[in-house]
């Protein structure tokens, strides 16, 4: 009985020590270059944000279960249409923990545009301090953080801000 308890404690300590090594606590600040996080699209193909270099990148961090996220989506689509032809790309990044919830939300919500899934990559959420969603982030054409907490698409200031960007 004591041996079982010792073995159990050994595994518990090993798990805690092992998980600490995997946690990336780096938090990004304005002006920081965005790391190479890997995301998946609905077909399973891997992508990184560096693929979008040369354009401003407006990131919408959302989840299928998030009502405020879904409420912003029509405004995001409208903003994307207004900015068509400009030097900006809009991308949705789902932080759903389960892939089928994300893909189901894509189908049910008839969500268009570029949609990626974090695929369990919690370091993305930690780096951007995205502990609450929806979260909107803006990267500059060089892949640097311009805004960590961008205003929502439903806020009229968002469009005004974007139109004032250099070489938009």
Language-model-detected regions and their locations in the chain:
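Active-site acidic short loop of glycosyltransferases
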Residues: 53-55, 85, 111, 130
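Short beta-strand segments
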Residues: 60, 91-94
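N-terminal "domain-start" segment that seeds a small globular fold
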Residues: 19-49, 158-160, 164-167
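Conserved redox-active cysteine motifs that mediate thiol-disulfide chemistry
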Residues: 61-78
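Short, internal strand/loop/helix patches
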Residues: 40, 103-142
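Alpha/beta-hydrolase fold active-site loops
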Residues: 56-57, 134
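Bacterial Sec-dependent N-terminal signal peptides
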Residues: 1-22
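Thiol-/selenol-based redox modules, centered on thioredoxin-like
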Residues: 138-168
């Amino acid at each position: 009985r004591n041996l079982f308890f010792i073995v159990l404690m050994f595994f518990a300590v090993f798990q805690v020590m092992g998980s600490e090594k995997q946690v990336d606590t780096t938090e990004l600040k304005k002006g920081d270059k965005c790391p190479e996080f890997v995301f998946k699209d609905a077909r399973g193909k891997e992508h990184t944000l560096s693929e979008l270099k040369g354009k401003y990148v407006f990131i919408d961090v959302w989840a299928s279960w998030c009502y405020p996220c879904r409420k912003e989506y029509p405004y995001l689509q409208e903003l994307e249409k207004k900015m068509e032809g400009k030097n900006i790309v809009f991308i949705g990044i789902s932080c759903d923990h389960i892939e089928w919830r994300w893909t189901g939300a894509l189908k049910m919500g008839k969500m268009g545009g570029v949609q990626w899934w974090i695929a369990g990559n919690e370091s993305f959420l930690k780096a951007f301090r995205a502990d609450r969603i929806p979260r909107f982030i803006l990267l500059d054409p060089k892949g640097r953080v311009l805004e960590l907490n961008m205003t929502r698409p439903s806020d009229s200031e968002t469009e005004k801000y974007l139109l004032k960007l250099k070489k938009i």
